[in-house]
Amino acid sequence: MTEQLKDFDVAEHLTSEEEIQLYLNEILQEDNIELILSALGDIARARNMSQIARDAGISREGLYKALSGTGNPTFATVMKVMKALNLQFQVQQSRFA
């Protein structure tokens, strides 16, 4: 008998504000815009994608596309999503000189 493995979905494990902050901060260290957008999508799914889309003032489909690997959202869109997620960027000196 073969055991079926379930696909891992990080959104299912983002159950607290602390986990969300730690996750996004780690992803931001990677300096990979596609990965960052994907992480924002994970967080939006963990928090209710439809509600986040409404709060950001964009369609649910538009939000999925913007935060997909093929999306190319404007910085304004990213900031609207961050605000809807109740998150903000914080600037500090780079550890990479």
Swiss-Prot record:
Family matches, as CDD domains: HTH_XRE
Pfam families tied to this protein: dnstrm_HI1420
Domain of life from the UniProt record: Bacteria
GO terms for MF: DNA binding
Protein name: Uncharacterized protein HI_1420
Organism ancestry: Bacteria, Pseudomonadati, Pseudomonadota, Gammaproteobacteria, Pasteurellales
